[in-house]
Amino acid sequence: MLDKSQLSADIAKSNQDAEIAKFDALAQEWRDPNGKFKHVLAFNSTRLMAIENAIAVHFQRDLNQDIPFQGLNILDIGCGVGLLCEPLASQGADVTGIDASGHNITLAQRHAQKWSIKVDYKHCLAQDLIGNEPQYDVVLNTEVIEHVDDQQLLVDTCCRLLKPSGLLVMATLNRTLKSYIVGIIGAEYIMKYLPKGTHDWNYFVKPQEITSMIAPHGLETITVEGMSFNPLTGQWKITDKPDVNYLLYALKTTD
């Protein structure tokens, strides 16, 4: 006699295995330097290097050490598939990555498990962490604010989650004519690096606006770095011109 419960269990397990395999493949695809996300990976590589250097300078750490960020608690808000979380965790930091997309968190978790990298991934919003009042040495908010309606709330939350003397890193796009031409017309319509409609120029944020938003929380902007893309080489570099993509670093001076 056919055991329908066993059959259902076998089908469920088969479906689950297929889903796991799909997520594993997607997680790996996100890290293929020659795959469809190669432009994102090139951008992330330069951004990561800049962030690592900023953390090392701020906390007086030597990047030549095996685990230079040991003892630091880092929060990545809008972590995506963990492109920043994993390398920072591999350098000794205790990393928490949160994202509003459960799909992203699943991909990140699968990849971290595969390579035995310890990251605490959570499917939640930044505001969801406020009740427990955890505080972090470093709070990262990269390429998120330009997609958020209540930008002030997001910045307020970032500041509240940061320890005194901690480092806030905000990465986004400046609201300039050049950013419209390069970041939207060029990236989305001409070069097609991003899907059309990825960005709304009206949501881009000027560095001085972030500086004003963080000031009531006792944060001061330390420096602002620009990021520039060379379409001929496909490479990004750090510049002193934050007129399109930029990174803003801020110090929390008070409780």
Regions from the language model: what does each represent?
Residues 1-37:
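N-terminal, positively charged/glycine-rich alpha-helical extensions of SAM-dependent methyltransferases
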Residues 42-70:
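Conserved alpha-helix/loop element of class I SAM-dependent methyltransferases that forms part
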Residues 55, 59, 112, 214:
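Conserved hydrophobic residues forming the short capping helix/wall of the S-adenosyl-L-methionine
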Residues 62-177, 207, 248-252:
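Conserved SAM-binding loop
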Residues 169-191:
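Conserved class I S-adenosyl-L-methionine
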Residues 192-209:
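Acceptor-substrate binding/catalytic loop of class I
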Residues 219-230:
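Conserved S-adenosyl-L-methionine
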